[in-house]
UniProtKB/Swiss-Prot annotation:
One of its GO terms (biological process) is single fertilization. It comes from the Eukaryota. This is Mat- sexual cell fertilization-promoting factor. It comes from Podospora anserina. GO terms for cellular component: nucleus. Pfam families: MATalpha_HMGbox (PF04769). Signal peptide: none annotated. Keywords: DNA-binding, Fertilization, Nucleus, Transcription, Transcription regulation. One of its GO terms (molecular function) is DNA binding, bending. InterPro entries: MATalpha_HMGbox. It is found in: Nucleus. The keyword Transcription applies.
Amino acid sequence: MAGINSILQTFEGLGEGDRAETIKVLSDMMREGTPRQPAKKKVNGFMGYRSYYSSMFSQLPQKERSPILTTLWQQDPFHKEWDFMCAVYSAIRDQLAEQNVTLQTWIQFAVTPLGIAPRTGYMEALGWVLTRLDDGTHTLQRMDVPDIRYHLQPMNGLGLFLSCLNGGLPIFDPQNIISQLSDPAFDVICINTQVPKIPGTFDTMSGFRQLAKQNPALAMSSLFQLPDTDPLIAQGVGMYEFHSVVSQPVQNHGMPPTTVPPMESHSHEDNMDFAKINEAELDAILTMYDTNTNGYIDPNKPQGF
């Protein structure tokens, strides 16, 4: 109240012209509202690289550490992988921050599916030796230039995220991130590596298959862009006998519990264990979704023409 009274007293002491001008200024200020926060700067590959490998030289002063990391980066064979990893991080940084996942945590789980050399053994793997000179400073020497074998197939942002998720990335609610990376607008975030000498397994589909084996409800939810509480998800999981995962009826925001279609009785040994489904079986399941009716095709019913 004291603030309001002060404003009123100020207005009472103003002339008509000054009062009108003051009201206009205040109105413009209110219309502008709170200034928008500037967009966060995107993390580039070198920033991620430096963040990850800097701890290898924690015993060195900053004036030595920076040029060493710059030299290593210039000769690092994984520039495209680092740029890609950090581009994906920048795209989902806000969602990751909401779940307390930092850049360091993201990198920790992303280096493995991208085939990037880990901190442990990095110098040896790429043929580098750090030598201490007589004056106490340090210099880099490269004793060998190894033949790097690329194990990575082309991957998009969703494929990398699924691989990190399967590797243990601590995300308790991945649905929003999966939905965002499934948007065609983010499909440009992709990587095309050199043709690998040894075929890799960390493409998008293999990452999705692994997620489906661990959490079929979440996998179907991300595939069909529906909340994992939607009755359709329980129908799809239940129809194909994923009993070990869906043990309780799904509630749909006040609607009656979803009824899973009745199935023939099987012994515990005969029940289909989703973790043992091979890729051909999973592919067959994924093709059972009818996009025209937004429902699953019951494989036991004859289909009309």
